[in-house]
């Protein structure tokens, strides 16, 4: 029985990956890899930046904040530009801009220069985020395939490769700019080779929206935005506080302190690669609600105490959050009466907002009430997200989506 289950899981896993052997689909996934690969490599040089600029960690935090503000700012115009030029061209050029500009971060000699460069880089990163998710949703719709979650899995994979391989390369390449420049050249060449005709991809026609209305006035999109906000706050909370929780509450040995985050990241990547076939089989509603339940089970294990129990809990949390955001990206581009680019931009914007306010809220909770209360608060977030999902996936919404897509599996 166990052997059959393992073989079944392996078949599902390979089904989610095999599509990317085709140039067209790998070209769609490549911007996700480039985005995280360049980001994780740049993050390796934050100690170098601190020493070079003679700034404190809090000052570096301002620089990171400027990057986030740049990303959020870009969301205000991304949708309009995508409608004009198309998802393909927008993704193509925003990726080139991102690759080029992030190199400049290691060349900064003053804090204000770093903040300006990261603000502009963040704007391109935000543009890239909306573009590549919109493009993936468009190709999914045109080709009647599911691979959005796997694209986000490639983002996780790119982050892992950048951090691990980048750490090794730092021993052989002593100049940060040379390292970043070589990586940028490789990324740019791959992008030019594999993106190809995807530059021409564009939604067939814009959806007419009454003037004076805002995307969030659509209750379905608002529901997805709330889910995205809360889930991305959850992701950020684990990434920010997992290591400290392992150290201060679990009292893990130094060797094991980082393994909570490692297990969370690993199972998030694995989950994203396997989630598309599961979504295709059971539907988005089941996947999202089941994933939220898995997150809660993971939190319960994390709070139970004990090193191995906590590691298993973080693994479940990573697997649980893996497919939720990709699913709402996909669904937000298919809402009747909402332009696909508006839907994706709205979900991306609320997600970035979660990353902005999440650390502030969690920092206050940790300082005032202790680290365990962070995870108790996450349970509240997940519960609200679950209720939002219940109301969002109502019969009226499902019928609209089915009539639009002619495919009941999408719900």
Give the residues covered by each predicted segment.
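Conserved MFS/SLC helix-loop-helix module at the cytosolic interface between two early adjacent transmembrane helices
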Residues: 73-109
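Helix-to-loop junctions at the C-terminal end of transmembrane segments
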Residues: 74-86, 170, 271-283, 366-367
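Helix-breaking motifs and short loop linkers at transmembrane-helix boundaries and internal kinks
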Residues: 54, 86, 107-112, 251, ...
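Pair of pore-lining "gating" transmembrane helices in MFS-fold secondary transporters
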Residues: 21-45, 119-120, 218-234, 315-319
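Cytoplasmic helix-loop-helix junction between adjacent transmembrane helices
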Residues: 119-153
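C-terminal transmembrane helical hairpin of 12-TM major facilitator-type secondary transporters
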Residues: 282-328
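Symmetry-related core transmembrane helices of the 12-TM Major Facilitator Superfamily/SLC fold
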Residues: 178-196, 375-391
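Extracytoplasmic gate region of multi-pass secondary transporters
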Residues: 42-43, 219-262
């Amino acid at each position: 029985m166990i052997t059959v289950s393992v073989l079944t899981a392996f078949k599902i896993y390979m089904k989610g990956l095999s599509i990317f052997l085709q140039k067209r689909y790998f070209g769609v996934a490549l911007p996700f890899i480039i985005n995280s690969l360049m980001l994780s490599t740049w993050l390796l040089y934050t100690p170098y930046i601190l020493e070079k600029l003679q700034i404190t960690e809090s000052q570096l935090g301002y620089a990171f904040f400027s990057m986030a503000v740049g990303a959020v700012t870009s969301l205000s115009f991304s949708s309009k530009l995508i409608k004009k030029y198309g998802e393909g061209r927008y993704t193509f050029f925003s990726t080139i801009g991102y690759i080029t500009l992030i190199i400049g971060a290691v060349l900064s000699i003053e804090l204000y220069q770093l903040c300006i460069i990261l603000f502009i880089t963040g704007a391109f990163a935000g543009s890239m985020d909306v573009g590549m998710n919109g493009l993936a949703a468009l190709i999914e719709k045109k080709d009647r395939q599911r691979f959005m979650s796997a694209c986000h899995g490639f983002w996780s994979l790119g982050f892992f490769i950048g951090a691990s391989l980048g750490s090794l390369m730092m021993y052989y390449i002593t100049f940060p700019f040379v390292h970043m420049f070589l990586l940028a050249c490789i990324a740019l060449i791959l992008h030019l080779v594999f993106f190809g005709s995807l530059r021409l991809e564009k939604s067939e026609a814009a959806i007419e929206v009454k003037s004076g209305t805002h995307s969030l006035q659509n209750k379905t999109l608002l529901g997805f935005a709330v889910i995205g906000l809360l889930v991305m706050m959850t992701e950020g909370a684990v990434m920010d506080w997992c290591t400290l929780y392992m150290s201060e509450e679990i009292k893990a040995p130094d060797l094991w302190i980082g393994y909570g985050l490692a297990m969370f990241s690993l199972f998030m990547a694995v989950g994203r690669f396997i989630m598309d076939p599961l979504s295709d089989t059971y539907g988005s509603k089941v996947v999202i609600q089941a994933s939220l339940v898995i997150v809660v089970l993971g939190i319960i294990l994390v709070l139970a105490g004990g090193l191995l129990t906590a590691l298993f809990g973080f693994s479940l949390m990573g697997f649980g959050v893996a497919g939720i955001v990709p699913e709402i990206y996909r669904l937000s581009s298919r809402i009747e009466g909402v332009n696909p680019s508006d839907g994706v931009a709205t979900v991306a914007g609320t997600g970035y907002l979660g990353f902005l306010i999440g650390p502030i809220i969690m920092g206050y909770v940790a300082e005032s009430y202790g680290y365990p209360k962070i995870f108790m608060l996450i349970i509240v977030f997940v519960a609200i997200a679950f209720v939002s999902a219940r109301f969002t996936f109502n019969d009226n919404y499902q019928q609209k989506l089915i009539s639009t897509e002619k495919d009941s599996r999408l719900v």
